[in-house]
Amino acid sequence: MKISIIGSGSKGNSTLIDINNKKILIDVGFSYKYIKEKLEKLKIDPKEIDYLLLTHEHADHIYGLNAFLNKVKPLLLLKEKLYNLLYEKHEYSKIQFLEEVQEVDGIKITVFQLSHDAVDPVGFLIESNEESIVYITDTGYINYKILFKIKDKTYYLIESNHDTELLINGPYPPHLQRRILSDKGHLSNEFCGVYLSKIIGNNTKKVILMHLSETNNNPNIALETTIKILKENEIIFNNIECANQREMVIVKW
C-alpha cells in the first residue's frame, strides 16, 4: 500500500492511493498536465488509474476533471448530487454513485458527510487487508458519529487549514475570515488536534496534515499545535507530517 499526495492546499488537491493492486486518485485539483508529470515521476502512466473519487465541486478539487476523464477514462465515483451539478460540463458514462458503503476490487470505501459550503461534500474511509486510510479535508467540523467510525485507523489524512490567530490578524477580509471559521469552512490547527486526540489509536501509524493555508498557516505551527494538543490529552504520537502545495509527500508501508 502506498499514499502519494500530489499536492494539497488552496491552489489544488490530488492524492493517489495504491492499494490492493489498484490505483485510486482522490480529486483532480490541478491541470491534467501537472498531474501527469507528477505521476510520471512515480513511474505511473495516468491510464493506470482505476478509480477517481471526488470530494466536492470546488475548483481546487476538480480543476483538471474534464481533461482527466477524457484522457484517462477511469471509473468515476462521486455523490449523485455532485454528478447532477457537474453533468452539463462533464458528461461521462463510466460512473458509480457513492453510497454510504461500497466495495470495489476488494477495497471497502465508506463515505461520510462533511460540513463545507459545497453541494454534498464528503470524506472517505478506505480499507483493505486490515489497513485503513481516513481522508478528510474541507470541513468546518467533524461530528461525533463520524469520529466513532474513523477511530483507531492506520493512516489519517486530515485538514489542518489555518492558525486562528494568523487568520484573524492576516490579510483576508472579514467576510472571508468568517467563512473559513464557520461550521461550513475549514478545520483550524486546534480543532484538527482535538479531533486527532479522539481518534488516534494503537493501530495508527502516521498522520498527514492536509490543506494548509499558505497565508494563514505554516507547517511548524501546524505540527507544534497538533503535538501539543495530543500531549495535553496524554497521547504521545510524533509520526506527523504536513502535506505540501507544490511538492509530493509519499508514504509507503
Task: Describe each model-derived feature in a short phrase.
Residues H58-I62, N84-L85, A118-V119, I142-Y144, ...:
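Active-site environment of divalent metal-dependent phosphoester hydrolases
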